[in-house]
Regions:
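Amphipathic alpha-helical assembly/interaction segments
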Residues: 1-149
Length: 149
């Protein structure tokens, strides 16, 4: 369901979310987060969740289901934005560091939003139905070939 991707790992948005997750892991492993255990865990979980939701959504067979998981990934990214603001407020990171990570989040959101829009469109539903028909026809032809043997 990733517009040409054969699996979720080929989706550019998943690659972006994974890179963001890794950057958050590096950030929260720094000594500045040593006293912020709960905030560290929340930020780590939200970043991990975004990439996971993108992957899980890809595994859904219906465009509406896929879109729902991408919306959850979107919400997790916005949760990360809030946790990064909390980290600034608690002096675990600087505003400059927050701004850099926020830029990455905005970039991922820009990748997610058109994909969500497509998955909610009539075009996506029509494409899924076309693929289902083609698959059924191939199976039917395969059975006829086997019957002829």
């Amino acid at each position: 369901m990733g517009r040409g991707a054969k699996n979720y790992r080929e989706m550019r948005v998943w690659e972006s979310a994974r890179a963001f997750k890794k950057s958050i892991y590096d950030l929260v492993d720094a000594k500045e987060f040593a006293k912020e255990v709960r905030l560290r865990d929340q930020l780590r979980e939200a970043a991990s969740s975004a990439a996971s939701q993108i992957g899980e959504g890809y595994g859904r067979f219906e465009p509406g289901d896929h879109a729902r998981y991408l919306k959850m990934a979107r919400a997790s990214l916005i949760e990360c934005q809030n946790h990064l603001i909390d980290a600034v407020d608690r002096k675990a990171i600087t505003e400059t560091v927050r701004h850099a990570h926020d830029g990455r989040i905005v970039g991922i959101l820009r990748e997610l939003d058109p994909l969500i829009g497509y998955l909610q469109s009539p075009e996506a539903k029509e494409n899924v139905e076309r693929i289902k028909r083609q698959t059924a026809e191939r199976r039917k032809r395969g059975r006829k070939s086997n019957d002829e043997l």
